[in-house]
Amino acid sequence: MKKIALCYDFDGTLCSGYMQNQELIPNCNLDVKKFWTSVTENSKKNNIDPTLSYMHLLEEKMYKAKVEISKQNFNKYGQRLKLFSGVNDWFKRIKDFGKKNNIEVEHYIISSGLTDMI
């Protein structure tokens, strides 16, 4: 049996936009657009990677808003993520298709997002 791997980005591929925009950022009493603008500004001002900038600012904002920073809390947000239509059964359908064609299909999600939400 042949083996293939399918790799996906999460944000914008499996769900619309950034996963944090759906509930996490709004639950910190933040405007999503303003948050990402501040991430860009912080990144340029401090000459740091935008991903590190967003992680730092999100942690800071969550702490200030008293939003729990824990694996369990991120899991709760992840369970409520709204995925694109068809994503929920996509992985099983492709695995089944692979089996019928003597192919083992493995799925991998590659993301710089919060993996505990995925």
Model-derived features: positions:
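Alpha-helical substrate-recognition element adjacent to the catalytic core
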Residues: 1-118
